[in-house]
Amino acid sequence: MKTVSTKSALAAAVKAARAAGKIMRDNWLKPKRVNSAEAHDIKLELDVRCQKLITKILFAAFPKISLLGEEGDAGDADADYRWVVDPIDGTVNYFFGMPHACVSIALQSKSDKWRVASDKKNTRRRAQNLLTPHSSHITILGVIYDPFTDELWTATRGGKTKLNGRVVRVSERAQIGEAVVAMGFSKSKENLEKSLPHLIRLARSALKIRLMGSAALELAYVASGRLDLYVERTINLWDIAAGALMVECSGGECYTLPAPGGKLRMCADNGLLRKKLQLGSLLK
């Protein structure tokens, strides 16, 4: 497959994110049909409906690009490019009427062109770049849309992260006592037990701790300097693919490690805090 125009792909992703965001906004306070309810999680019919709309828009623009999504995959799994989609990140918040949820869309490539360019530009961060140490794909653009605030974050590899068209950067806070830190909690007993001691330690040392329930938005907030660090022990690729690129493109770092079941361990920060916090046991 020939090289995809990032400008055209970004435009398609923005269109799809806004369309799905409109569905979210229009149905926010209406009764919602639950497809499944598991321990600590909810799956909505609206998740499926939003992903179907996103898929339709993206495939109309790029029919040969595959899609990996929270609500299922589409297209040729061996394609050189793939979309990575979370149609509603923060579904539990959304279901309970809390306006903290978003649409997250990333485009990834297998091409070594992007990997080489990324490594040359980010030699200092080479070990931190999202998935480059342990994946055949590299994220080349990301879009996150919050339909409740009408905030749209965009990033393309090698460029700057933008919020509603304006460049944003990570914070410059270097002391944990000045930092606002967010954590996410996975659903297994083991991961909860490993995460809680770190939550207590961070709560004692950080300025404030936040548990906000949307990994994509937390990463967008790190990229914008609203949060200083976000950490989660077990998370899916579609939750973080777009946001991790945004953190990197705004001057921060996103450190990931593979976890069981195809999941990831992740810590994103402004580039000044992670190594000071000794989070190694949380990410193992």
Regions found by a protein language model. Give the residues of each.
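DPxDG-like acidic metal-binding loop motif
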Residues: 78-115, 125, 129, 134-162, ...
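Residue-level detector of anion-binding/catalytic polar loops
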Residues: 23, 64-66, 208, 228, ...
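N-terminal subdomain of lithium-sensitive/metallo-dependent phosphomonoesterases centered on the IMPase/IPPase/PAP
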Residues: 1-88, 110-115, 121-122, 129-130
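Conserved beta-strand termini and adjacent loop/short-helix elements that scaffold enzyme active sites
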Residues: 70, 212-214, 257
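Short loop->beta-strand "edge-of-pocket" segments that line small-molecule binding or catalytic clefts
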Residues: 168-190, 203-212
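Residue-level signal for inorganic ion chemistry
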Residues: 20, 24, 47, 58, ...
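Oxyanion/phosphate-interacting regions
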Residues: 1-11, 15, 193-204, 217-284
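Anionic-ligand binding region
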Residues: 159, 163-168, 194-201
